[in-house]
Amino acid sequence: MMRPFHLAFPVTDLKLTKSFYVNILKCEVGRSSDAWIDFNMFGHQVVAHLVDENDHPASNSVDGDEVPASHFGVVLTMSQWKELKNHLLEQKIQFIIEPKIRFKGEAGEQATMFFKDPSGNALEFKAFNDDNQIFAK
């Protein structure tokens, strides 16, 4: 069994962050303080830390899209990915990269989508029809 990962990231507004991660991404809240919030994101611990400002780095070209160099997310099952995609569309989330299939017909073919949280952190959620393709060359 794979162990959960831990990721901490900066946010500029804890109230908006909590609303987004709970209501949009359906994360559960763990411990919190006036400076941070733990979230359960698909079984992984992600922690939003309050900062004064958030500087977002550049992007890189990947399969024709400008992908934020700094981003995080979860590799979902294809059914979870489709369910999340439909939920995000219903919530009228503005995508950085619309839901699509990347590397079509190539090694590593995947469903992917990118969007930002209220503090401008880029998130990517992806899925593979065959999990053996996750690290394919």
Label every model-predicted segment.
Residues 1-15, 72, 127-137:
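N-terminal beta-strand motif that seeds the catalytic metal site of vicinal oxygen chelate
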Residues 4-11, 40, 60-137:
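Vicinal oxygen chelate
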Residues 7-22, 56-65, 92, 121-122:
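Short N-terminal helix-initiation segments at or just after the protein's N-terminus
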Residues 10-53:
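Core segments of cupin and vicinal oxygen chelate
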Residues 13, 43, 52, 76-78, ...:
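Non-catalytic surface loops within mature trypsin-like serine protease
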Residues 29, 37-38, 61-64, 104-105:
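Short secondary-structure boundary/capping segments
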Residues 47-48, 54-58, 131-134:
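A short local loop/turn or secondary-structure capping micro-motif enriched for an aromatic residue
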